[in-house]
């Protein structure tokens, strides 16, 4: 069976008009024509490092003086378990439910957490791989390829070398395992798991300056990471290991996550949105609901709710 000849420009244009309509086609053409200009302007904006949030920036985000930042951070810590359905008082009941309804699952969860404490990960078909004492968040540990951690996220390449999978560092940096560590810390009472969760969050923030490196190249993963961090913080909120200094650092990074997402939403030139855009919105919704004290939060929440309602009409066809 012979391959079909590629469509010429006129045929492609006609096909596009038939599929999305004349007005949408015109809008897409304008967006494509303006793309180089928009890209240059966005790059210039990004290089001014607008997303990084230092302590003074965090105080401004909370609308408090630097002297009052400690109290603002403490208010967030106390509020998180109420904003997400986490109740330390129900631990005994949860353990009983595990034993009755899912025998062996709690033990398996602890075993998984122990492997994570040993920096052993099994991602995307890799099989168990020990990553060593210090986790390299920028490396595809399946192929050994490492992305430049200082590179602007706009310049991060993928699909450029055979056998290299950018999704490996992305999957690791989503932080799903941090929630498991926090969960295990809560259910067992053992400080080992909370300590490891806190150490990995610290290491990630230090190794991944906002907007630099492979782990900022996909906004969807930024959003997923923010959600997982918020859950981990809510579960660990009662831990004495969660110090004000540490929580301040994490909250500053979460504010940076929110600002990054608002500035890098995943919408195609033709206006088509996908699961990536939905993930961006859910990340903003979580940040808006969980960090209500932050001045940006109401805008994040309002935008996310409005767009999620619109996307349900666009993306859910059943």
Protein language model regions, located:
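Exposed alpha-helical structural elements
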Residues: 9-12, 25, 57, 68, ...
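Generic detection of long, well-ordered alpha-helical segments
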Residues: 7, 16-19, 23, 59, ...
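Extended, charge-enriched "interface" segments that sit outside catalytic cores
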Residues: 36-160, 167-171
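Aromatic-lined, polymer-binding surfaces characteristic
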Residues: 147-151, 156-159, 165-318
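Boundary detector for helix-to-coil junctions that initiate low-complexity/charged tails
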Residues: 1-33
């Amino acid at each position: 069976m012979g391959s079909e000849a590629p469509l010429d420009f006129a045929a492609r244009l006609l096909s596009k008009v038939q599929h999305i309509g004349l007005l949408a086609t015109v809008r897409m053409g304008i967006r494509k024509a303006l793309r180089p200009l928009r890209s240059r302007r966005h790059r210039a904006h990004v290089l001014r490092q607008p997303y990084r949030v230092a302590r003074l920036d965090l105080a401004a985000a909370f609308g408090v003086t630097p002297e009052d930042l400690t109290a603002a951070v403490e208010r967030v810590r106390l509020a998180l378990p109420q904003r997400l359905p986490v109740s330390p008082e129900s631990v005994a009941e949860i353990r009983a439910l595990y034993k009755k309804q899912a025998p062996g699952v709690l033990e398996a969860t602890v075993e998984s957490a122990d492997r994570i404490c040993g920096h052993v990960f099994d991602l995307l078909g890799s099989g168990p791989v020990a990553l060593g004492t210090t986790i390299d968040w920028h490396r595809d540990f399946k192929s050994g390829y490492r992305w430049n951690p200082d590179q602007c996220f706009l310049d991060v390449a993928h699909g450029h070398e055979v056998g290299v999978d950018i999704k490996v560092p992305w999957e690791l940096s989503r932080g799903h395992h941090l929630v498991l560590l926090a969960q295990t810390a809560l259910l067992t009472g053992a400080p080992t798991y909370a300590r490891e969760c806190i150490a990995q969050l610290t290491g990630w923030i230090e190794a991944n300056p906002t907007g630099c490196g492979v782990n900022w190249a996909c906004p969807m993963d930024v959003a997923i990471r923010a959600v997982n961090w918020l859950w981990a913080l809510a579960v660990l909120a009662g831990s004495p290991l969660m110090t004000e200094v540490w929580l301040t650092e994490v909250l500053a990074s979460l504010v940076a996550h929110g600002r990054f997402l608002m500035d890098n939403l995943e919408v195609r030139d033709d206006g088509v949105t996908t699961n990536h855009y939905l993930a961006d919105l859910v990340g903003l919704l979580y940040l808006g609901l969980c960090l209500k004290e932050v001045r940006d939060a109401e805008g994040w929440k309002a935008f996310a709710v409005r767009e999620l309602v619109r996307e349900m009409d666009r993306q859910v066809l059943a």
